Amino acid sequence: MAGTNKSYFHLHMISDSTGETLIMVARAVAAQYANVTPVEHVYPLVRSQKQLDRVLAEIEEAPGIVLFTLLEKDLVERVEATCKDMNIPSLSIIGPVMELFRAYLGRETSPRVGAQHTLNAEYFNRIDALNYTMMHDDGQHVEGLEEADVVLVGVSRTSKTPTSIYLANRGIRTANVPLVPGIPIPPQLETLKKPLVVSLHATPERLVQVRQNRLLGIGAGAPLPGRGEDSYIDSRSVAEEVAFARKLSAKYDWPLLDVTRRSIEETAAAVMKLYADRQRQHG
């Protein structure tokens, strides 16, 4: 309802695929309205009129904004007509983009036989990447590193795990290995040929800050990998860790990526660019 003073609103998202793109766009916009909370209703894999019946019935029960990514013309027209009858706003997220392509290319879209199978293949590829990434987190199962697309290395608290998971959600099989002074790196890491190895690093000051926050969260005295609590947050020790990681990265010619002021999304985007560049170089 236009001009509502409620602290929440219903946000309906309809997709004929996984709905990931739709959710990302919707949340990015909703985040700009800090005082209003969206109640999300996500309807993935909607590909028939029968499936749409259920969706439209739920929208009628809780009217709100309707966003959709549907390719079937009949489904699009029905969503738009029904929302108009209900007097609620609706918008195709891909419609304007397709119109832009159509105007620039001067041609209509051509039906792609098996296009949905391609979408399904991409979905299962992401699932496979996630499974691999979770199995190869924090230096686990190093014997399988050669099967990775990307291997992230770095000292503690350089966002290796969350970046790995983000990349896996893009279908990139990602392993991560911690670099700890005094502990030899896995021999498998020295002989990798297929994967791109990227070294994540941050300033000692930033690492100390992040690690102090972590200790506050888990409680003092919690076990830390390969070190005591004092050295974990000691400025000099952390600076030595950073220097150690840089020296190791130079030795093996691993590209360095500074994550000091980067969000997880920005770090992942930078890694994906390095990965894409490498793919092009290797044909």
From Swiss-Prot:
According to the lineage, what is the superkingdom? Bacteria
For the protein in the UniProt heading, the enzyme class is: transferase
Keywords, ordered alphabetically: Kinase, Nucleotide-binding, Serine/threonine-protein kinase, Transferase
Q: Its catalytic activity?
A: N(tele)-phospho-L-histidyl/L-threonyl-[pyruvate, phosphate dikinase] + ADP = N(tele)-phospho-L-histidyl/O-phospho-L-threonyl-[pyruvate, phosphate dikinase] + AMP + H(+); N(tele)-phospho-L-histidyl/O-phospho-L-threonyl-[pyruvate, phosphate dikinase] + phosphate + H(+) = N(tele)-phospho-L-histidyl/L-threonyl-[pyruvate, phosphate dikinase] + diphosphate
Question: What residues does ADP bind to?
Answer: 154-161
Q: Which HAMAP family match?
A: PDRP
Q: What is this protein called?
A: Putative pyruvate, phosphate dikinase regulatory protein
